[in-house]
Every structure is written in structure tokens, then in C-alpha cells.
Swiss-Prot record:
Transmembrane segments: 40-60
Gene assigned in the entry: SSH4
Regions of this protein lying in the Lumenal compartment: 61-542
Localization per Swiss-Prot or TrEMBL: Vacuole membrane; Endosome membrane
Name of protein: Protein SSH4
Length: 542
């Protein structure tokens, strides 16, 4: 009977799978539908597949990280002085400022290609340019660049100075005393004003200014600085460059022309370790332009801005300490930037067009269409000059550097705070000594309006300072034949008597600050004084 009730209680139950159908023993239907079961199996298999792929990618990345270098790369892990550089730097070295093509040839191929390029480019240069190139090679051979990982150049003392002073701790190093006249007088190539403003003088031939500290390691995404072209003559006989470089850097070379340097040249050329012809990839600079350089820590990317607009990302995976550098050169001593060199440059299409228009107008019939050559090119650049025989004064160039002490033209740098640090550091701004805060003091202002009144006739805290006893001077003595004279008797007095009188007077002197005494004490003192005077007169007569 109970089995029949159980069967009636589950009329829709099916038999258990794998057993013969039994109408008596049945269970509830809790199985998943066929479509849902297929979806679940598909998801499980898909997750397993993705997990295996992720594991394979992790293994490949580990292998490339630790076992991807070959013997040739490991052989370059030491400098010429035998000191090793960290693993991190050489993993970032794959596209580190090698040349304008951003290629990474081997050491042998690099040397051979350099020899081929020297044989091609050096004959096109002036003797002055060739001399600079040879001096640069010798300089960096004797003093190789300090290629160190980012943030390793500074010691603990330098870091503390930067932390305390902030941007105020940065400044450009002064000019090297290498340019003198026939009398040995120093002719500075540039002046440093207000720590960060560099003015290149008329004595400049070719020089560069480097900052005392490298790019800082702050807690932002990037670090950024801007340089404003404060003074630069139109059609100038000089060029300048702005960029980043290692230390020590040849002081007689502009940035971008020596190893481990990158620069934005005023001609619009982008130079990366390139002393020869470079490509014109950027706008030409004029007076009032603002050039910016930034460095992103995460990717090691260097980017350039012009008048607040980002132009390009120049390099990637740069992981070394770089210094801010400014340089200028007198182009009259070069062939590259004179008329012939500018004609040979394939990027100077506008110059060739202006020169052809100049020749056409000057040879035309109408004199009103005459164009002065000074509007196209400086007269000093019409031919190559020799600095040893023909001295040409350089046009003055003034560049102002902004590390964050002022607002940036590049908006992103202001929003994300890419400055070198705080303006005054942890110490803060120094106190003001110009008197503006003092003038706002209410007490001092009230004192100026109502000067205090001092008592004149009343006996004040210090007593009667106007009494005759305290203000009278001792009687003057006249001297005759070396002996003091008595004013009353007009006779000489012996020195012994004078000494006795002096002692008596010293005892009788009252202090300058008098104190009121009782009347009895004052009367007795006057009697003693009269007795002493009578005694002294008797001694004199005797």
C-alpha cells in the first residue's frame, strides 16, 4: 500500500539512468537540460585553453627577460674603465640614442658605417668643423660619458640639497676659460644670469652650458622643462640647440653633435649623436618661441613640444641620467650653415626658393622689386670664414629656462605637475626684507602717527639727570713748566699735593645716577667735605 502511495506521489518521475525501468522506485528530476550542459562544458574548455596560453606567454617572457641576451650583448656590459653597469640599463639600451634612424647595429657594423660616413661628410665641412669633430672624439676618448642608470648620479648629499632647496638648487655651470684674446684676457662665451638664464655673447665661437644636476626622479608620470627663445635675431649668423646630454660633455660642442645627446636645433633639425647632416623634422625657431623637453619614467620616452604643442616622441627605453644642455655656435665659421652648405641641404627648399626670387628681382627691370639679401641670409654666411684669420662677432642669443618655477606653456605639464620639484623645497620661501610686511604692522603705524612724549623737568625713574652736580665738569687745570697750577692762587702745585687732591676729589665724586639720601646723611657729608678742604689748604701754605 505504501509503495502505491509513493508511486502516486511522483507521477512524472523518470527511472534512474543506468538501471532498468522500475515503476516503483523513482526520484525527482533535478538534472540540467541538454543545452545548459553543453554551454557549461564549452566555458570550462575555453577557460582551460586561455589558462594554458597565459602560462605559455609567462614562460616566454621569463625566458626572454633572463636568457634572451647573447654573448655579443653581454660583452658590452662593461665600460672602457672596466666598471660594470646595471642590468636594467642594458635592457633599456636597445633603442638608446644611437642615430637618427633609431637602429641598433652591432659594434663592428657601427664602426664601419661611421668610417664610411666620415669619408663622405668630412670633405664637405670647413676646417673649423673638422677640428671640432676631431676634438670631440679625443675628448670623449679621454673623458668618456658617464652612462649610469637613471637616478644613480646623485649622492645622498646632493639629494638632500635638492629636497631642501627644490628648483632653487638647479643652475647652469659657468663658461670655461678657453677663449682669450692676444693679451690673455678672458672672453666669456656665455653668461649665466639668475641661475637658469643663459646669454651667449659676441665672443662665442662654439660652446655649450650644462646644468649641475640631471633630470630628477619625482613621483609623477614624467618630468618636463621649457626653454624660451628670449633673444634671437632674424637671419642671425649663429645657431643654437636645446636638448639633453650626458656628463661630461664637450664644452665646445652644441648638444646633439656628440655621443649620448639629443637636441632640437634652431634650424629645425633633430640631432641625436649626429655631427653630420641631420633631417629637418621640426619647425624653425624664432624669437619668442618656447621649446619643451619631457621624459616619461615608465617607458623611458623623450618627447618634444613647440609652443605648447606636442610634436613627437623621439626615443624610447632610455634609462640613463641626462642633463639639460644649451649650446650656440657661430655659423660663419662653418660650411654647413653658409650659403653653399644650405644649397646642398635637401631640406632647405624654402631657402633655395627665396634665393632664386632674390636673384630674379635684383636682375629685373624694376628697381622697386629689389630684395635685400639681409632678409634672406646674414651677410656673414655668404662665405666661410676662418676663426684664426678673420674674426666675426656672433649675434647675441638669450635663452630662459623654466623648470617649473613658472607656469608651462604645455598644458599637460601644468595639470599633471611635471615640474622638477617644488619651487623652494622643504625649507620654504625666505623671509621678505623689503619692508612690505613691516608697513602693514598696526603698532608701528600707530607709533609713526603719535610719537611718544618724554618728560623733561620731572624726576624720572633714573633720578634727576639734569642736576648740576651730575652734569658739571671738573675744573680745568692749566699747566706751567710741567706742574699743574692752582686756579685760585695762580701758583704751581706739587705733584704729591695734586695726587692727594685727586684722591680726595675721587672720594667726593657722586655717581652720575644720583639716589636720594636722608637729610642727616647729606648734612654730615657736607661737613666732612669742608674739613678736608681746610686741611688741604693748610698743607699747601705749609
Amino acid at each position: 500500500m505504501g509503495l502505491i502511495v509513493l508511486q502516486d506521489g511522483f507521477p512524472n518521475d523518470r527511472p534512474i539512468q543506468g538501471f532498468p525501468s522500475d515503476p516503483v522506485v523513482r526520484v525527482p528530476d533535478d538534472t540540467i537540460p541538454a543545452d545548459d550542459a553543453f554551454s557549461l562544458m564549452f566555458l570550462i574548455s575555453l577557460s582551460i585553453t586561455f589558462g594554458l596560453l597565459l602560462l605559455v606567454l609567462i614562460l616566454i617572457s621569463i625566458y626572454l627577460t633572463f636568457c634572451g641576451g647573447n654573448d655579443g650583448d653581454d660583452s658590452d656590459d662593461e665600460d672602457e674603465d672596466g666598471t660594470s653597469v646595471s642590468f636594467k640599463f642594458f635592457r633599456k639600451r636597445n633603442s638608446l640614442l644611437l642615430d637618427s634612424s633609431f637602429m641598433t647595429p652591432g659594434k663592428f657594423d657601427d664602426d664601419e658605417s661611421l668610417k664610411v660616413r666620415e669619408a663622405k661628410e668630412l670633405p664637405k665641412m670647413s676646417s673649423f668643423e673638422v677640428e671640432l669633430y676631431e676634438r670631440t672624439k679625443e675628448f670623449q676618448k679621454m673623458s668618456p660619458p658617464m652612462v649610469k642608470p637613471l637616478g644613480s648620479f646623485l649622492n645622498s648629499q646632493d639629494k638632500q640639497v635638492i629636497k631642501d632647496r627644490g628648483i632653487q638648487s638647479y643652475f647652469f655651470l659657468p663658461s670655461i676659460n678657453d677663449n682669450v684674446d692676444i693679451n690673455g684676457a678672458f672672453l666669456p662665451s656665455f653668461f649665466v644670469e639668475d641661475k637658469l638664464n643663459v646669454s651667449f655673447t659676441k665672443f662665442n665661437i662654439s660652446s655649450s652650458a650644462i646644468m649641475n644636476y640631471p633630470l630628477p626622479m619625482n613621483k609623477k608620470d614624467a618630468v618636463y622643462f621649457e626653454v624660451k627663445v628670449y633673444k634671437f635675431k632674424t637671419c642671425s649668423n649663429s645657431i643654437f640647440s636645446i636638448g639633453l646630454m650626458t656628463c661630461p660633455y664637450p664644452y665646445f660642442r652644441i648638444p646633439g653633435t656628440a655621443a649620448y645627446s639629443i637636441a632640437y636645433e634652431s634650424t629645425g633639425k633633430l640631432r641625436i649623436n649626429n655631427a653630420f647632416g641631420a633631417d629637418t623634422l621640426l619647425p624653425k625657431l624664432e624669437e619668442g618661441d618656447v621649446v619643451g623637453f619631457g621624459y616619461r619614467y615608465s617607458s623611458g620616452t623623450i618627447f618634444i613640444t613647440h609652443n605648447g604643442k606636442k610634436m613627437m616622441d623621439v626615443t624610447h627605453k632610455v634609462g640613463i641620467d641626462l642633463f639639460v644642455g644649451l649650446g650656440a655656435m657661430n655659423a660663419a665659421y662653418t660650411r654647413t650653415y653658409t650659403k653653399d652648405g644650405l644649397f646642398e641641404d635637401p631640406d632647405n627648399v624654402s631657402f633655395r626658393q627665396k634665393w632664386s626670387e632674390l636673384q630674379a628681382f635684383n636682375n629685373g627691370e624694376s628697381s622697386s622689386d629689389y630684395i635685400d639679401a639681409r632678409n634672406v641670409i646674414s651677410k656673414d654666411l655668404l662665405q666661410v670664414h676662418d676663426p684664426k684669420e678673420d674674426t666675426v662677432s656672433s649675434d647675441n642669443i638669450e635663452l630662459h629656462v623654466n623648470l617649473g618655477q613658472l607656469g608651462f606653456v604645455f598644458i599637460e605639464a601644468n595639470v599633471k605637475k611635471y615640474a622638477f620639484g617644488s619651487v623652494y623645497g622643504d625649507i620654504g620661501i625666505p623671509p621678505a626684507y623689503n619692508g612690505d610686511d613691516i608697513k602693514q604692522d598696526m603698532l608701528l603705524q600707530k607709533g609713526d602717527e603719535l610719537p611718544p612724549e618724554y618728560p623733561d623737568d620731572a624726576v624720572d625713574f633714573f633720578g634727576d639727570i639734569h642736576s648740576p652736580a651730575s652734569t658739571s665738569e671738573p675744573p680745568s687745570a692749566t699747566f706751567s713748566a710741567g706742574l699743574p697750577m692752582d686756579n685760585a692762587a695762580d701758583t704751581p702745585v706739587s705733584t704729591a699735593d695734586a695726587d692727594a687732591d685727586a684722591d680726595a676729589d675721587a672720594d667726593e665724586e657722586e655717581p652720575l645716577i644720583s639716589v636720594k639720601k636722608p637729610a642727616a646723611q647729606t648734612h654730615s657729608k657736607k661737613n666732612n667735605k669742608k674739613k678736608k678742604k681746610k686741611k688741604s689748604n693748610r698743607n699747601r701754605r705749609g
